[in-house]
Amino acid sequence: MTQSFDAIVIGAGQAGPSLTSRLTVSGMKVALIERDKFGGTCVNTGCMPTKTLVASAYAAHLARRGADYGIVLDQPVRIDMRKVRSRAATVTANSSKGVENWLRNMKGCTVLQGSAQFEGPKEVRVGAELLSAPRIFINVGGRAIVPDLPGLNEISYLTNGSILELERVPEHLVVIGGSYIGLEFAQIYRRFGAEVTVVEMGPKLVGREDPDVSDAVRDILEREGIHIRTSAECIRFARGNLGVRVSVDCMQGEPEILGSDVLLAVGRRPNTDDLGLDRAGIALDPRGYIMVDESLQTNITGIWALGDCNGRGAFTHTAYNDFEIVAANLLDGDKRRVSDRVLGYALFIDPPLGRVGMTEAQVRARGLPYLSSTRPMTRVGRAVEKDEILGFMKVLADPSTKQILGASILGTGGDEAIHGILDAINAKTPYDQLRWAVPIHPTVSELIPTLLLGLQPASAA
């Protein structure tokens, strides 16, 4: 027997629960399906547990630096990994349970646990239950890519999910992948006391960023004793006495990296391969992402895709914004579009990188004339007071429209300070209006007006 609903939401990640709330408030009868843990990647294996680990690692780092601030410890810093893991697990469990309780107590919402599979464009099966609805919303997230590398099937390896279960500090952690996830874990475990090597296939770390940002990130990590190998074109694995042998050169006989543990952090893939999307006629791109239009509708009327599975943004905040876009178009008569989104994001190493808008390379690729200004964090009083002076700020602007095109803040508080620029871009505020702002002293953000005053023409060549 088929159960009929006004809407079906598949997945309880960042977009699904909030959308369910809006739909039920509007009077709809909604079925929400979750096959695993409530809260999605962010709550369970992403932002929340990892940033809890970042905080623990920062505490260890600051304790070791205590003498720099006149604080002398009587004994070396000791890492209690069981306590570290327990703390992260508690934060995760509380958040996940909060989402689950919210949904289960939501009037008009029926929660079903199990794997969803399409039977047609209006029908979804969950175990023995067959559901139907004129509106279906897919919010199934993604998972770590396991690359096809020689020897990988002969060794044990970690992903961003399984590494959260460790209750020990690896002797030597080899991180495959030099982008956001890999670098955050690299610094975390280095600060916990592990030897760490980062192996990146590309020519630089955080490959989407400008070379000056990439070089500064590398310098920060190498100062902490993290080994970095870029342009590793021939990565292969074998078992070794310590645990694993990792080769990175194409020439046989080249020195190997001897590690105890391997973390794979080479990217993410969408969880779309077991949904039966073909039975609904839903189109995918070559990488398995669900293709959507500007309002996040798929090629099938009445079906939407939100969050990591649509390939239009791989962040918690973009997934939540997907919910806002769908709700605005469907319920509020507000024609919001994905392309209107001003994308900001952060790399949560210490010091963090806050980013918004275009990189300098992207501006040049478009052949745009632009203004540029850069200032080191040594010019920021707050950074000097904290003795955390690594990094710099950079801003790019259009000389004719006076719009800010993009910015990078790599330094203490950069993940927070970048929001002033993000908001200005979103509000289309000309940069010359920000020049005369009177920011609070002492803060990281107070250098932004000075940064804007320093804008000078740059070549687009």
Residue ranges and their predicted role:
Residues D6-I8, A31, V174, W304:
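Conserved beta-strand elements of the Class I
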Residues C47, V140-E195, V199, H227, ...:
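Glycine-rich dinucleotide-binding loop and its adjacent helix/turn
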Residues T2-F5, Q14, R22-M28, I33-V169, ...:
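Glycine-rich flavin
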